[in-house]
């Protein structure tokens, strides 16, 4: 096979150098990596789509064998940490706040996501607590003992119902539950073309739920060095710099104190960008 060099690499079909070890089962994914004396985290997740959180009770779960700690959203905020932001971060080359194309349409509503839900859950599976234990089995067993006291609210499950201006807001400040809005192209020319068309077909189309379903589940290994005050996270992802900036923003530390290592990644499809 001839070597492709220089500018010939741009747009060329390049040979993949990692495939041989993958087909031989020699890949190094996050779950293949282990650290001395590592602990295991297991998330307790909401079983309902929409509810106010009255209380997360962890007393009995904390007594389980090999459990080290159980954290809730209240513990996270008490330590002074912030949300995971889904907007432009200073120094981020991808600025979602910039106007779309040549119009002034807001591209994305500024929403903050907390690692552990605080006062409300907004979807089935949203994490409400994190059990940390010496083994994954011990963490999973203790998670079964965490009690969620929830005030169940009406969910929004239909896209047409959800997008109505008077619809129940799942995230406050998002009328019609619209978080991304964009109008592109030339409206006047489009209207003129439709007027001249022999046939115009109109309709509403409901797009089914789409999931970025990669083969490798989301996972990560977190380490902290007390001497250097450096946090290291090893996780398959689609951009170490974005991970670095988002984690630094949430932990309120200098990005230089966050080190992100990306091992082999078993698929992403966009979901591992955050």
Q: Each predicted region: which residue ranges?
A:
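Structural alpha/beta core scaffold segments of enzyme domains
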Residues: 1-274
């Amino acid at each position: 096979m001839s070597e492709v060099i220089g500018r010939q690499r741009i747009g060329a079909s390049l040979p993949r150098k990692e495939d041989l070890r993958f087909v031989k089962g020699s890949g190094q994914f996050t779950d293949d990596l282990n650290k001395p004396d590592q602990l295991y985290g297991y998330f307790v997740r909401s079983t309902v789509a929409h509810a106010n959180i009255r209380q997360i009770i962890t007393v009995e779960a904390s007594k389980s064998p090999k459990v080290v700690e159980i954290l809730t959203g209240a513990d996270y905020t008490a330590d002074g940490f912030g949300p995971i932001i889904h907007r432009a971060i200073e120094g981020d080359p991808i600025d979602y706040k910039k106007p779309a194309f040549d119009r002034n349409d807001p591209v994305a509503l500024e929403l903050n996501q907390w690692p552990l839900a605080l006062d409300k859950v907004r979807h089935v599976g949203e994490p409400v607590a994190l059990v940390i234990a010496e083994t994954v089995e011990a963490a999973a067993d203790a998670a079964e003992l965490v009690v969620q006291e929830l005030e169940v609210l009406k969910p929004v499950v239909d896209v047409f119902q959800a997008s109505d201006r008077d619809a129940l807001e799942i995230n406050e400040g998002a009328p019609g539950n619209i978080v991304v809005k964009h109008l592109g192209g030339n409206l006047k020319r489009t209207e003129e073309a439709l007027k001249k068309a022999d046939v115009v077909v109109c309709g509403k189309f409901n797009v089914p739920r789409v999931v970025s379903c990669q083969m490798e589940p989301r996972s990560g290994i977190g380490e902290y060095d007390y001497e250097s005050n450096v946090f290291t996270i090893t996780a398959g992802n689609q951009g170490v710099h974005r991970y670095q900036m988002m984690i630094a923003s949430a932990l309120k530390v200098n990005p230089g104190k966050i080190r992100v290592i990306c091992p082999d990644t078993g698929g992403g499809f966009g979901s591992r960008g955050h």
